[in-house]
Structures are given as structure tokens and as C-alpha cells.
Curated annotation (Swiss-Prot):
Name of the gene: PDRP1
Regulation: Regulated by light/dark exposure.
pH-dependence annotation: Optimum pH is 7.8-8.4 for both catalytic activities.
Subcellular location as annotated: Plastid, Chloroplast stroma
Region (Disordered): 1-76, 94-124
Known partners and oligomeric status: homodimer at pH 7.5 and homotetramer at pH 8.3.
Family: Belongs to the pyruvate, phosphate/water dikinase regulatory protein family. PDRP subfamily.
Pathway involvement of the protein, from the record: Photosynthesis; C4 acid pathway
Cofactor: Mg(2+)
Catalytic activity annotation: N(tele)-phospho-L-histidyl/L-threonyl-[pyruvate, phosphate dikinase] + ADP = N(tele)-phospho-L-histidyl/O-phospho-L-threonyl-[pyruvate, phosphate dikinase] + AMP + H(+); N(tele)-phospho-L-histidyl/O-phospho-L-threonyl-[pyruvate, phosphate dikinase] + phosphate + H(+) = N(tele)-phospho-L-histidyl/L-threonyl-[pyruvate, phosphate dikinase] + diphosphate
Chief location bin: plastid
Keyword vocabulary terms for this entry: Chloroplast, Kinase, Nucleotide-binding, Plastid, Serine/threonine-protein kinase, Transferase, Transit peptide
Species annotation: Zea mays
Protein name per the record: Pyruvate, phosphate dikinase regulatory protein, chloroplastic
Amino acid sequence: MIGCAKPLAAPLQAWARPPSPAGRRLPPSFCAPDTSPALTRAVESPGQSQSDDAPPPRSGEAASSLAPRASSHLDRWSRSRALRSGHRPALNRAALSSASVSAPPVIKSPRPEDAAVAAEDGEDDDVCEAERDAAAGKAIYIVSDGTGWTAEHSVNAALGQFENCLADRGCAVNTHLFSLIDDMDRLIEVIKQAAKEGALVLYTLADPSMAEATKKACDFWGVPCTDVLRPTVEAIASHIGVAPSGIPRSFPSRNGRLSEDYFQRIDAIDFTIKQDDGVLPQNFYRADIVLAGVSRTGKTPLSIYLAQKGYKVANVPIVMGVALPKSLFEINQDKVFGLTINPAILQGIRKTRAKTLGFDGRQSNYAEMDHVRQELVHANQIFVQNPWWPVIAVTGKAIEETAAVILGILHDRKQKCSMPRISKRY
């Protein structure tokens, strides 16, 4: 006799109970738990048991009694995959291996009825590109009760350590962001789908009960998982001696009042858009940062990125034969930064830009190498005449990297610290 498996936490126990007979039946190809008698006993509540020689339930009844109600979107993912692949994907149940030894999982073949259901729902190969691409690489599920940007940026930074492998498709990875997951039903659906795809689950859930339920559910279905923020939150709580609130950023009462930081960012973005490309040079004195460089060195996108961080930014194009605004030399020179770039890279960018605008080589010398070099030499002469302007080479740099260099220099000049840093008070 195989004993009952240890029950999960309260939210998961509620899911594991069989629904009422009137409950809705799921489509035949829905990836429900194994329907073997041993696994059926494993999900019963403590104290219940069945004899080993009891007849196994019919597969349709087992799926109906054990499977929870799932969202139509995730359900359709499951059915479309089964129809395309010709079999139902096996579910990784490492946590239940001891309960499923005596009976192998049931693998269903697609039936005409399945195709009929798919036809009714209008499913085809274009239902979900993420589903189709999942077979091309390992899946990473990012689950958050907020926007998920924090976890997504953390994952992107971590994936940067595997660039060589990712570039040659030796270890292809697909990331899938699930944001605003704030109830248990949706959380369970996502984890079940992760189990089907053999995905890694990375989550940022402020509510401790949701985070604990995620860990237990992932253990139950054999899904590898990691809490991205919990170690940091616990370290800060220990350092300042205050317990965390457990309230996600998206919680209504938390967003009831707009912070001063929010209005500062809105004001910075509005200012930056109005000062783009040297417009209104009389307002340069109001800017926190002023960028100068030849065309296509990334002044505008860099300005917008910095504005989203709350900095008012103006940018000035350096053009041969056009004098720079007088106000540029009258403001505090600590906030002026020059941008330069490799001429070959700049030529390639300009060629693409010219093609987009419908220019060709006969109409403009904008993308000619000689002209590109002359402009860069002219800009360098201006930078030499103004040695207090830090000149940053943007070749091969992401906007975030260039912004980090600028902010590091800016804050170091303001604070006169022994070590360069970017400081912010909360």
C-alpha cells in the first residue's frame, strides 16, 4: 500500500480537492495529474485510502475530478500543443515520484473530438507564437504581482553572463513575463503551464503567503523556482530593523497618493521632449544635463532614458558651419557632456537612417565616410576647446551603460566623494 502524500498549504489543499459532480469537464487533452490509482490516493486528504485492487477510474472522470478550473487561454495552449505534437506532454512530478512508481502516466493520442474542439475555438498554428517557439529553447517564467520589470531586468542582466552561448543558439532561452498575478488561481495555472514546458520559475511576490504558496506548488509539480527579491528584502529588513509590509507595488491603497518622485519624472520628461535637438537654448540653465554630439550619436534616446529617471536633459547637435548656442557656454559647465562614436559605426547608422528617409548618395553626403570623419573631427575640436566637458565614446555601449557613466560623473562632481557613486535619498 502506498501512503498518502504530504498535503500542501491551505491554498493548494483547496485546489487539490475534487470538485463537485456538477463541475465543468476539461477538454480531453488538458494536462491533468496522472489518473493512476496510486496518484489518486496521493492527492486525497489525510486519513483517506483505497484498496490496491480497486478498479481504476475512467480517464475522463479522473481528469474531471482532479483538474482545477483553468483559464481558457492556458487551456488552449495545452490543447493546441497536443494537436500539433500528436501527444500530450509529460508532466515533471519529481515531488510525487514515490507515489507514481506503481502506475505509469497515461499518454493520450489526439482524437477527432479534440480536433473538433480546436476548430470550434478557431485554433491554428498562429494561436500563440510563444507556444510554438518554446521547443526552440529553455523556458523561463517571470511571475510578479506588479509590472514584473524588476524581475525582468534582473533576468536580462543574468542572461548577459551567457551571451556567447545564446548568440550561437547553443543554449537558446525564451522568457515569458506574467505580471499582476495577485490571486491563487492564476498563480496555480501559471505554475502548471511551467511544469508542462519544463520551465524555470523566477518570481517577485511581495505577499509572503503568495510567495510561500509558489514555492510549495513548484515543489509539488517538480518545477525549479527562485524568489528574486526575498533575499534582498530580508537583508534590508535585518539591516534597518523594520519588518517589510508585504504589500505589492500595484496594491490600490499604495498607489492612492502620487509621490513627489513621480511628478519629478513627469516634469523631467516634459522638459526633455521640448528641448530636443537644440530647441529653446535659453532654457539650458534649467537642465540637469546637457548632451552635445554630432547627428546619430544617440542624444535623443539617451535624453529620454535619463528623463525617465527624473533628470531634465537638453541636447545640442554639433553641425559643421553652424555655431553652437551662446547659452551652452554660459551655463554651469559641470553638466555638459560630449558624445562621440566610431566613424565606421556612425556611417552604418546614417546609411540606415538615410534609407528610411528616402535619401540616396547623390542627394546628400550625410552618410559618406569623408563627411562623417570631418564631422567627428570638428566635434573633437570643440571638445578640446572645452576640456571640462567629459567626452563619452558610445560605440558598442547600451543607453543604460552610457547613462550610468554620465550619472556617476555628475553625482561625483556634486558630492565630491572619495569614491564615485550615484546617491538617492528615500
